[in-house]
Amino acid sequence: TGTNCRATVDGNYIDNCFIEWSNEHDDEPEFNSEFSFSQLNISNNIFLASHVAPWFSYIILKPHGAGHFINGLNVQGNFFRIIGGTIERVERIDTSFADTNFSRMRNITWRDNMYNAVDVATVNPLISTHSQETESDKWIVSGSPQLPFGGWARKVEALVAEGPIRNAVNVKRYEMPYVDLAQGADNDTIHVNWSQPVRGDIVISMRMDTPL
């Protein structure tokens, strides 16, 4: 129930329960030049639940005041499984009192987890393959819905072509594109920009946070 919790949840069997991270005991819960939600490690746990509603989640962030963000979270090496149905995703933000500031998310690692009967396998950084079949000078690559907490596409760590990039007359292009971050109505897409309309395949690694 504190933001800068300095806690590790490691090696547990978590049966029909969830982790809720809140600041409900803060008498001034709005963000005010502090660390915000930080220093939480959730690793190597077995999460199991049965016959739950599709909106059930195992990891819930619940800010009780406006302006907060995540400033250090590691979720790695966990098993997530549902019996007797499926759930939409394993994590969510409870906005009963306030939402979070997605533009300030920082130092979030969410990887090497395993999912069964979960619609969306969350990961950060997200490695995505994009195939552009028709020539365009702007390729739109979405990070939704796999970025944690429905986060913004805020950083690109790497971008590489898988095979040749070709223009409308089938000539190979060797240029390096540039990207526009946090695009679209939900800020969850990347625009990959070229000097001319081209087609091809790329692999892109994107994040919903600012890494250290």
Set out the residue ranges of the language-model regions.
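Extracellular parallel beta-helix/beta-solenoid repeat domains
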Residues: 1-211
